[in-house]
Amino acid sequence: MEIPKFLFITVIAIGLSGSLTWANPLANPEAEATAEAGPEAEAVAEAVGEAEPAVSLILSLIPLASLSPAIKSG
């Protein structure tokens, strides 16, 4: 069975977007910088760190939704 080219490209794109998200420095803010900035900055950094993986997941699912008709017809 031959793997469709668009499916292969989609899997690679999702893999790359996931690795880029976890490599982002905002996901793990430095403790020293957070302590100097205060509790407000700590709350913002924590919220951003928690939201980024979800945003990456949502963005990775958008191409799959647009490919759904092509998968069903092919």
UniProtKB/Swiss-Prot annotation:
Disulphide bonds in the chain: none
Keywords: Amidation, Ion channel impairing toxin, Neurotoxin, Secreted, Signal, Toxin, Voltage-gated sodium channel impairing toxin
Propeptide residues, chain positions: 24-53
The keyword Secreted belongs to this UniProt entry's keyword annotation: yes
Secreted in keyword set: yes
UniProt GO MF annotations: sodium channel regulator activity; toxin activity
Transmembrane regions: none
Compartment(s): Secreted
Residue numbers bearing the Serine amide modification: S73
One Gene Ontology cellular component: extracellular region
Domain of life from the UniProt record: Eukaryota
Tissue specificity as recorded in UniProt: Expressed by the venom gland.
Signal peptide: 1-23
Family: Belongs to the formicidae venom clade 1 family.
Function: Vertebrate-selective toxin that causes pain by targeting voltage-gated sodium channels.
Record's protein name: Myrmicitoxin(1)-Pr3b
